């Protein structure tokens, strides 16, 4: 029998659109069990007794593994199954559960995922010099669970748009997508997480749908769940940002990061595997899900009304729009590299580079050509017509 936590996880994942087979893989049970639990309105009452006949020959081995601090029931299940165990997972869990109180609270079992199964996301921050000024650099780290290969994106903010951009760039860098993305409870991804009942940010759900991954959130105050990526945040602070302290721009930061990953991070030896992330990624890459045809649009979105002189105002400056749109609403998108795109009825009608107000109004002459034609079309009269009035 599954736990109450597993019951609510099944319900939640199904509500978020997960397939039965993916839920079964995540929970560690059969698809038939998932379907049965989806029919229950409430968690079924736990049976008071389990028949341990099938498990009894393996109890000494299980106790030995627990003494070695191996508490992952899936790992133990795979091991005893190879030794001839024919029972189910629930029997093993029932046996392990009362023994968990013996587990030291500060010790954490490392859960090893299969290739392409999971990517862990987290933010870090550090103060360095950019363009001659001391400033805070935020950096998003996206780590593949199997290979430990990671991608880093430095940005001025940790908002939703930069969070999504970091994942877009990571998927492009890896050349494929994963099945699940594990995030902390930042507002860019999670609006509410109440005892496992997660409400995800709608933008993050759109990103998940675009790349066909299942979003997952850490339990509150349980950051160790994504320990792989948190170790990489610490690694960056103690390695890259110790080596490099001055940058020309955020673009320069990202260029240096990419070079450092290729030269240093990808080639470090992972002690538990005796392999490098580069070597393990060679095994994982072929399992990644294919990328969609287009990148997810991470631009800022807003609405503007075109003035009667055929301009819109953005960020304290004015930008021209085709005169036919005077007085009409238009939608705008501002990319993270400051490209302004203007749409009418979802059709691109103008584009500009964002500029400060001191740079002056930004005008495309073709936008206002019809207006100038109207002004120039005045009636021409011979001089004799004016002489007759004298």
Curated annotation (Swiss-Prot):
One Gene Ontology molecular-function label: DNA binding
DNA-binding region boundaries: 20-39
Domain HTH IS21-type: 5-66
Keyword check for DNA-binding: yes
Pfam families attached to this UniProt entry: Mu-transpos_C_2 (PF22483), rve (PF00665)
A GO biological process held by the record: DNA integration
Claim: Cell cycle is one of the keywords in the record: no
Family statement: Belongs to the transposase IS21/IS408/IS1162 family.
Cited PANTHER family: INTEGRASE PROTEIN (PTHR35004:SF7), TRANSPOSASE RV3428C-RELATED (PTHR35004)
Function: Involved in the transposition of the insertion sequence.
The protein's name in its UniProt record: Transposase for insertion sequence element IS21
Gene name of the record: istA
């Amino acid at each position: 029998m599954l736990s109450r936590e597993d019951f609510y996880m099944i319900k939640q994942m199904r509500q978020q659109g997960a397939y039965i087979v993916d839920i079964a893989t995540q929970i560690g049970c059969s698809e038939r069990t998932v379907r049965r639990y989806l029919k229950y309105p409430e968690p079924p009452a736990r049976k008071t007794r389990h028949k341990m006949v099938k498990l009894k020959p393996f109890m000494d081995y299980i106790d030995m593994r627990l003494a070695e601090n191996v508490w992952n029931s899936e790992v133990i299940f795979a091991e005893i199954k190879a030794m001839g165990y024919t029972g189910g997972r629930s029997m093993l869990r029932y046996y392990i559960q009362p023994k968990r109180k013996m587990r030291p609270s500060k010790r954490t079992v490392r859960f090893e995922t299969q290739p392409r199964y999971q990517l862990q996301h987290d933010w870090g921050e550090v103060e360095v010099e950019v363009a001659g000024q001391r400033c805070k650099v935020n950096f998003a780290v996206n780590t593949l669970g199997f290979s430990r290969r990671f991608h880093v994106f430095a940005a001025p903010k940790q908002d939703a748009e930069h969070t999504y951009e970091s994942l877009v760039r990571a998927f492009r860098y890896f050349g494929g997508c994963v099945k699940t993305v594990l995030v902390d409870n930042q507002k860019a991804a999670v609006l509410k997480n109440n005892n496992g009942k997660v409400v995800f940010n709608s933008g993050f759900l759109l990103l998940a749908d675009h790349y066909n991954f299942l979003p997952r959130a850490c339990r509150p105050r349980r950051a160790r769940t994504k320990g792989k990526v948190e170790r990489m945040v610490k690694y960056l602070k103690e390695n890259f940002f110790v080596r490099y302290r001055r940058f020309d721009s955020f673009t320069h930061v990202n260029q240096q990061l990419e070079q450092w990953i290729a030269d240093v991070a990808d080639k470090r030896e992972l002690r538990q595997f005796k392999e490098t992330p580069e070597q393990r990624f060679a095994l994982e890459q072929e399992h990644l899900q294919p990328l969609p045809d287009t990148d997810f649009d991470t631009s800022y979105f807003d609405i503007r009304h075109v003035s009667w002189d055929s301009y819109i105002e953005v960020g304290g400056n004015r930008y021209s729009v085709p005169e036919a749109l005077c007085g009409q609403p238009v939608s705008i998108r501002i990319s993270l590299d400051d490209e302004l795109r203007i749409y009418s009825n979802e059709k691109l009608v103008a584009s500009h580079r964002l500029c400060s107000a001191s740079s002056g109004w930004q005008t495309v002459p073709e936008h206002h050509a019809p207006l100038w034609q109207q002004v120039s079309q005045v009636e021409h009269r011979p001089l004799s017509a004016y002489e007759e009035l004298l």
